[in-house]
């Protein structure tokens, strides 16, 4: 079987689902002698809802997680992944990779499993909806108002268009991106090359 990243992602999601998890992203770095496969996971929506109930005090027992919602943080914005989750997923998925020979020609490879982190990538419409109101930095395929690099607060979606509030970043004086005279900019989701959250600590 030839190496196929989509096949690997699909296999990873099968394993993740059996653990109450979702695959957020898959990254691959290949070389002649060594390969690196990174899988980013989080609790699925049902499990995140349970953790949100725990953090609000509605459930007495709270498990220790890599990312629990801080005070004032939207509970939908954390992954809820534990080290035990990563370890269990890594064991099961590593076995599947070898049994189904999904890493052909790789005599050695490293499988790295972790949460997506506070600076996670946004890759789907659901991500933009879930993290509405968050700070984000993004780049576009084609320039918007003469600029391909933007930072701002996501003000919501209008159809397939993302509205970005630029005033938050101007007030903080962050970033070296070209400034726009406008306070908001509209960017088509299909024009977004890469988008990533900016942690607010």
From Swiss-Prot:
Disulfide bonds: none annotated. Its main location: cytoplasm. CDD domains: YlxS_C. InterPro entries: Ribosome_maturation_RimP (IPR003728), RimP_C (IPR028998), RimP_C_sf (IPR036847), RimP_N (IPR028989), RimP_N_sf (IPR035956). Keywords: Cytoplasm, Ribosome biogenesis. One of its GO terms (biological process) is translation. SUPFAM superfamilies: YhbC-like, C-terminal domain (SSF74942), YhbC-like, N-terminal domain (SSF75420). GO terms for cellular component: cytosol. Transmembrane segments: none annotated. It is found in: Cytoplasm. Required for maturation of 30S ribosomal subunits. PANTHER family: RIBOSOME MATURATION FACTOR RIMP. Belongs to the RimP family. HAMAP family: RimP (MF_01077). This is Ribosome maturation factor RimP. The gene is rimP.
